[in-house]
Amino acid sequence: MQRIILIIIGWLAVVLGTLGVVLPVLPTTPFILLAAWCFARSSPRFHAWLLYRSWFGSYLRFWQKHHAMPRGVKPRAILLILLTFAISLWFVQMPWVRIMLLVILACLLFYMWRIPVIDEKQEKH
């Protein structure tokens, strides 16, 4: 029963993480890490799919090995975060929603700032 629950949570996390790529309020990284954790404990097949076949695979393998982001990925991720939040702030009219978005943005940027980076060239040596 626990295995089935972990698989369901894992797939739910994959869906939410994928939606998080385009929706600024949903963070991608924590959901994909949750999916990897769930699949590692419940399904070697789904875990292998996530690590080697999915769009997130190379980033997950890098995170699993180094607990860091590749140097070039971090600025692109931050730029995408800023762009999606700017679009949201442009369309939202309610002040309390704008404030909420700005607070979420600040927390997300702080989280991103704290993630260590490593050069991919340095990693290969």
Curated annotation (Swiss-Prot):
The keyword Transmembrane applies. It is found in: Cell inner membrane. It is a multi-pass membrane protein. GO terms for cellular component: plasma membrane. Residues 1-6, 64-74, 119-125 are cytoplasmic. Pfam families: DUF454. Residues 27-45, 93-95 are periplasmic. The chain crosses the membrane at residues 7-26, 46-63, 75-92, 96-118. Keywords: Cell inner membrane, Cell membrane, Membrane, Transmembrane, Transmembrane helix. InterPro entries: DUF454. This is Inner membrane protein YbaN. It comes from Escherichia coli (strain K12).
